[in-house]
């Protein structure tokens, strides 16, 4: 037979507490002064494992008149290893305090009543000692300003710097006892640069990615230092062997050679202008014969065809002007038509950056001319897993020099550099630089435009004997520096 036992005193007490919890009610204790809000803290570099090991101190602003500063509060926390500081003002303060409200509730388990108080959240950041931190007394007995910066010999200047940074939110203001302030950082830290101090912080608290980047940078630094040392020793050995004057002379000679790499063969001792830059060096006999069919339209061009070219903008203005003055003689007309066609091809070819495909200018170009353009006026590069023909800046200069020579042979060894420069999309300074390197005589001439205005053009003339060779502006500047 089962017996029914009455509950004991412990069970009665537990039921009373359960009933109280089930019927708990909360009581808001009103909006206190900002200086009396409860303090909630969070740590920026991790979670708190042993709350009992932390020693917290709360500091309130002593300025009760200024409404902006009277609510300023600073929370300091100490452990055996680190100190932490958090404040509710400046750029380091949490924005959530202004956007939302925090509360702390204290539950009385006996009465079932929870008292709710306003709270404020602080973000605690570690404060590193002995990292070259300047301590400046701002006023009062215990108010100081701490900031991470490079040590300054002049304490007054450092104070001005820190005050300006404090207004920008780059400093931390804390309240400390005079005995807790270390006036002089250790000697080993005084010799450290700001970069070294930042690297120490990354070593201690940086992420895996930051530490990996730091190790890579240090390894590269060691490698670059070794390389610089080796280069310096090699340079000293060469200077001791050859001498400074010989090295400067070699450098100037290299500059002169680099400057004429883009020029075609020049015969400076030629007796006639047509022999200085020979036509056969621009177009070989085989290439000249291959232009018979493509240049037929230019050879048979009429005034109506020229007007149509102008309307359709199918050819550049310099080519159209050359077509207007084709000679009547069949032999000379044929030669100039082929030269003008190749000049037009060079101008269109230079406007490109990368040649995609095997055809430089599309269909209709003779194979020998297409091969000439790709081999003589492009550089072979490797990009995105495939080879490409690139028209580099030096190749553009080479195309410009060949275009000038063709224009000289077409127009009795005088070329309108300004008109040709516009079609080549080139600056006047660069055009004159190339023309001078080709040893042309530069002159000015007024040219009448279609609307009646006059424009000053630069003309380049090839005449013998050739004027002295002139270096480019870049080489002249380099020679002056040497």
Curated annotation (Swiss-Prot):
Q: Does the keyword Nucleus apply?
A: yes
Please indicate which superkingdom the organism of origin belongs to.
Answer: Eukaryota
GO cellular component, alphabetical, reads: fibrillar center; nucleolus; nucleoplasm; RNA polymerase I complex
Q: Which residues carry this modification: Phosphoserine?
A: 226
GO BP terms: namely: nucleolar large rRNA transcription by RNA polymerase I; RNA polymerase I preinitiation complex assembly
UniProt subcellular location: Nucleus, Nucleolus
User: InterPro entries, per this entry?
Assistant: RNA_pol-assoc_fac_A49-like (IPR009668)
* Alphabetically ordered keywords of this record: Acetylation, DNA-directed RNA polymerase, Nucleus, Phosphoprotein, Transcription
- The answer to whether keyword Ribosomal protein applies is no
Sample GO molecular function, one term:
DNA binding
Describe the PTM.
Acetylated at Lys-436 by CREBBP/CBP, leading to decreased RNA polymerase I transcription. In normal conditions, deacetylated by SIRT7, promoting the association of RNA polymerase I with the rDNA promoter region and coding region. In response to stress, SIRT7 is released from nucleoli leading to hyperacetylation of POLR1E/PAF53 and decreased association of RNA polymerase I with the rDNA promoter region.
Q: Which residues carry this modification: N6-acetyllysine?
A: 436
UniProt region (Disordered), positions on chain: 460-482
**What Pfam families does this protein map onto?**
RNA_pol_I_A49
Which family does the entry's similarity section mention?
Belongs to the eukaryotic RPA49/POLR1E RNA polymerase subunit family.
Give the protein's function.
Component of RNA polymerase I (Pol I), a DNA-dependent RNA polymerase which synthesizes ribosomal RNA precursors using the four ribonucleoside triphosphates as substrates. Appears to be involved in the formation of the initiation complex at the promoter by mediating the interaction between Pol I and UBTF/UBF.
Describe its partners and assembly state: Component of the RNA polymerase I (Pol I) complex consisting of 13 subunits: a ten-subunit catalytic core composed of POLR1A/RPA1, POLR1B/RPA2, POLR1C/RPAC1, POLR1D/RPAC2, POLR1H/RPA12, POLR2E/RPABC1, POLR2F/RPABC2, POLR2H/RPABC3, POLR2K/RPABC4 and POLR2L/RPABC5; a mobile stalk subunit POLR1F/RPA43 protruding from the core and additional subunits homologous to general transcription factors POLR1E/RPA49 and POLR1G/RPA34. Forms a heterodimer with POLR1G/RPA34. Interacts with POLR1G. Also binds UBTF/UBF. Interacts with PWP1.
The name on file for this protein is: DNA-directed RNA polymerase I subunit RPA49
């Amino acid at each position: 037979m089962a017996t029914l036992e009455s509950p004991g005193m412990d069970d009665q007490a537990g039921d009373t507490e359960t009933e109280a919890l089930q019927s708990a009610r909360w009581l808001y204790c009103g909006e206190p002064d900002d200086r009396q809000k409860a303090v909630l803290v969070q740590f920026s570099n991790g979670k708190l494992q042993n709350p009992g090991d932390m020693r917290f101190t709360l500091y309130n602003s002593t300025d009760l008149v200024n409404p902006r500063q009277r609510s300023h509060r600073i929370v300091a926390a100490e452990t055996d290893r680190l100190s932490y500081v958090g404040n509710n003002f400046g750029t380091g303060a949490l924005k959530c305090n202004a956007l939302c409200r925090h509360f702390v509730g204290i539950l009385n388990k006996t009465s079932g009543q929870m008292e709710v108080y306003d709270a404020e959240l602080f973000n605690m950041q570690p404060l590193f000692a002995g990292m070259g931190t300047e301590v400046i007394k701002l006023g009062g007995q215990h108010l100081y300003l701490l900031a991470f910066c490079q040590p300054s010999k002049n304490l007054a200047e450092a104070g001005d710097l820190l005050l300006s940074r404090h207004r920008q939110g780059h400093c931390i203001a804390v309240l400390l006892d005079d005995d807790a302030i270390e006036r002089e950082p250790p000697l080993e830290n005084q010799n450290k640069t700001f970069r070294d101090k930042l690297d120490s912080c990354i070593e201690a608290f940086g992420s895996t990615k930051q530490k990996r980047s730091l190790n890579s940078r240090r390894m590269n630094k060691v490698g670059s230092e070794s390389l610089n040392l080796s280069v310096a020793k090699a340079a000293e050995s060469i200077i001791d062997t050859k001498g400074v004057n010989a090295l400067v002379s070699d450098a100037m000679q290299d500059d002169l050679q680099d400057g004429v790499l883009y020029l075609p063969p020049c015969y400076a001792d030629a007796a006639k202008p047509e022999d200085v830059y020979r036509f056969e060096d621009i177009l070989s006999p085989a290439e000249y014969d291959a232009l018979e069919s493509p240049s037929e339209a230019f050879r048979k061009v009429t005034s109506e065809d020229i007007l149509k070219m102008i309307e359709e903008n199918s050819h550049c203005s310099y080519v159209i002007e050359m077509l207007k003055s084709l000679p009547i003689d069949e032999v000379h007309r044929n030669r100039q038509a082929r030269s003008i066609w190749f000049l037009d091809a060079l101008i269109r070819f230079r406007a490109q950056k990368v040649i995609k495909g095997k055809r430089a200018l599309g269909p209709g170009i003779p194979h020998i001319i297409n091969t000439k353009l790709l081999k003589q006026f492009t550089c072979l590069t490797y990009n995105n897993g495939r080879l490409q023909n690139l028209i580099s800046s030096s190749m553009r200069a080479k195309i410009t020099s060949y275009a000038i020579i063709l224009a000289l042979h077409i127009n009795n060894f005088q070329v309108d550099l300004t008109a040709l420069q516009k079609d080549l999309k080139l600056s006047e300074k660069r055009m004159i630089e190339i023309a001078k390197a080709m040893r042309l005589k530069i002159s000015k001439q007024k040219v009448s435009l279609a609307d009646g205005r006059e424009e000053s053009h630069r003309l380049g003339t090839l005449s013998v004997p050739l004027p002295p060779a002139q270096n480019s502006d870049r080489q002249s500047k380099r020679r002056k520096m040497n």
